[in-house]
Amino acid sequence: MSKVAEELVEILAKRGESVTFAESCTAGLVAGAFCEVAGASKVFRGSVVSYANEVKRDFLGVSEEVLNGVGAVSRECVEAMAIGAAKAFRAQLAVSVSGVAGPSGGTPAKPVGCVFIAVFYNGQTRVVKCNFSGDRQAVRSQSVQTALQTALLVLNEN
């Protein structure tokens, strides 16, 4: 994990860019994993844990239509979360996560382990839908790994 975070820090520092995170089900674990890297402070602007829909709406700008329609665990929500975080923290790279970590809260359409991750960079957003298995800790751990790996993939493609 730290290897991926180290690469992210290195690339962002070389480019003179910064990163932010907007997290729901991971509750700050992605930012925490990123900041384990020495030198992360050069590129890390800050992050928000937006567990409550009101925070998603009021701080990150996720619309009521999204929250009341497709819901917080959706492609549309994580895309808006990432864009909102990039604006709020004035960061070039923004990563967002929202999902059902369990052990309860799942539905047939969005079972435990259903997690959406978005990476916003250069005006474009990549969203991935994951279906992780395991207990709450396993789902959250896999979410952190996938979020950082997806961010690195996006940076390497740009």
Model-flagged regions — what are they?
Residues 1-158:
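Short alpha-helical segments enriched in small residues
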